[in-house]
């Protein structure tokens, strides 16, 4: 008999509306006869929204598209801090049905997720847009207000130029197994940084990080589910401002360069990625946080942008 292979055809199952704008300004001026300067920058913003998609009930809106979804949405829980005492933990366990998240009892140092719909259960409801239980949109990964700032000034052969770039608003939320963020887990590649030492203990009640659970890969999730759900407590701002380039140069006087048979000579110093301003934990680079590496796809577990220092000479014969 003969065999026949039929390939499904590609179809366009969704429509989106993209809106954005961009502004760019540049000004050059002169002070006296020797000082020349310029200053400028750009600012751009764009968002996307789903306007048509075959998901009428909005099933699983945190992972699926639905009409009205803002591209980049992050769904998660609201949290009201960490449980501090065994009495508080017992009350939390006895008051709420937490079985959707974990079969383990909550302990001091675990995250206190909030019951937004007051049904005494912490869950995602029917997992539809109309009933997501205690989950809601807590952030968005879309980079907003991307900008550059540049300036230069020169005086009698000495020049200074610099360029900053950044993003004004962007969110990033660590996943359950993002050990690079949590600093604990089941795998050998768990890396502990100084930031992770600020974890909860009775002596450190105001800690940022919750209980650092570790254990076998097959059993740790039931413990990690008590602390590492996507939540507003651990929502990160991936906004940043970075000095991408700084260059200082000096044009040697013609009388000097001509003595050695050159028509022009310039010495310069250049630096890239010299300064970065961000609220992210110190182990993350804002330009690399949404990508992984060849070994693991874990977001942010990547080499940071290199700082590059250069010194050189440019000559014209």
What are these regions, as identified by a protein language model?
Residues 25, 39-41, 162, 267-269, ...:
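Membrane-embedded beta-strand positions of outer-membrane beta-barrel proteins
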Residues 169-266, 271:
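Extracytoplasmic gating/loop element in the C-terminal half of outer-membrane beta-barrel translocons
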Residues 7-12, 134-137, 231-235, 296-301:
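Extracellular loop and loop/strand-boundary signature of outer-membrane beta-barrel proteins
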Residues 11-17, 21, 28-139, 181, ...:
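Conserved small-residue
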Residues 1-6:
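Short, small-residue-biased leader/transition segments that mark boundaries at the very start
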Residues 33, 157-160, 255-256:
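Repeated loop/turn-to-beta-strand initiation elements of outer-membrane beta-barrel proteins
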Residues 27-29, 43-49, 155-157, 166-170, ...:
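Transmembrane beta-strands of outer-membrane beta-barrel pores
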Residues 22-24, 305-317:
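Outer-membrane beta-barrel "beta-signal"
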């Amino acid at each position: 008999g003969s065999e026949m292979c039929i390939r499904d055809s590609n179809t366009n199952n969704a429509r989106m509306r993209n809106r954005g704008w961009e502004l760019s300004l540049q000004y050059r001026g002169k002070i006296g006869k020797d000082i020349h300067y310029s200053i400028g920058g750009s600012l751009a913003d764009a968002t996307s929204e789903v306007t048509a998609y075959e998901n009428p009930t909005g099933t699983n809106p945190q992972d699926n598209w639905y009409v009205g979804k803002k591209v980049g949405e992050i769904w998660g829980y609201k949290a009201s801090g960490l449980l501090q005492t065994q009495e508080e933990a017992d009350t939390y366990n006895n008051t709420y049905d937490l079985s959707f998240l974990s079969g383990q009892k909550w302990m001091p140092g675990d995250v206190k997720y909030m019951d937004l719909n007051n049904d005494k259960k912490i869950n995602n409801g029917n997992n539809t847009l109309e009933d997501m239980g205690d989950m809601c949109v807590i952030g968005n990964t879309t980079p907003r207000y991307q900008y550059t700032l540049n300036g230069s000034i020169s005086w009698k052969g000495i020049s200074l130029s610099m360029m900053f770039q950044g993003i004004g608003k962007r969110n990033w939320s660590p996943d359950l197994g993002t050990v690079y963020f949590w600093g604990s887990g089941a795998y050998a590649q768990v890396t502990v940084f100084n930031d992770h030492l600020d974890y909860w203990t009775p002596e450190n009640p105001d800690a940022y990080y919750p209980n650092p659970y570790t254990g076998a890969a097959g059993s740790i999730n039931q413990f990690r589910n008590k602390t590492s759900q996507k939540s507003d407590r651990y929502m990160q701002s991936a906004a940043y401002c970075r000095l991408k380039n700084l260059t200082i140069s000096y044009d040697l006087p013609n009388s000097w360069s001509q003595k050695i048979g050159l028509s022009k000579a310039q010495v310069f110093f250049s630096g890239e990625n010299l300064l970065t301003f961000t609220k992210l934990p110190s182990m993350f680079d804002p330009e690399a946080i949404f990508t992984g590496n060849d070994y693991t796809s874990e977001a942010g577990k990547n080499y940071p942008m290199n700082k590059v220092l250069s010194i050189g000479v440019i000559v014209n014969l």
